[in-house]
């Protein structure tokens, strides 16, 4: 099961007792801030959680799986996420007994 933005807003509503519309706007604003920073080429560091980074990938050879034809995969910039040590530890602890 995946956690959705709607579920995050619902959690804010239940936990903080704020209006549902305001909770949804807060979640949207949080992610919009991250999007804008990445669009501007900035790294996003969330203490205790992890970092969103931009990485440039060079052009490389690829292959069309249907035809087997060689085709170049163009150079591009991708977003990567590196979890922080606290997040890694909590996930490991949560899954240790499973």
From Swiss-Prot:
Residues 49-72 are annotated as: Disordered. GO terms for cellular component: cytosol. One of its GO terms (biological process) is regulation of translation. This is Integration host factor subunit alpha. The keyword Transcription applies. Gene3D superfamilies: IHF-like DNA-binding proteins. GO terms for molecular function: DNA binding; structural constituent of chromatin. InterPro entries: Hist_DNA-bd (IPR000119), Histone-like_DNA-bd_CS (IPR020816), IHF-like_DNA-bd_dom_sf (IPR010992), IHF_alpha (IPR005684). Heterodimer of an alpha and a beta chain. Belongs to the bacterial histone-like protein family. It comes from Shewanella loihica (strain ATCC BAA-1088 / PV-4). This protein is one of the two subunits of integration host factor, a specific DNA-binding protein that functions in genetic recombination as well as in transcriptional and translational control. Keywords: DNA recombination, DNA-binding, Transcription, Transcription regulation, Translation regulation.
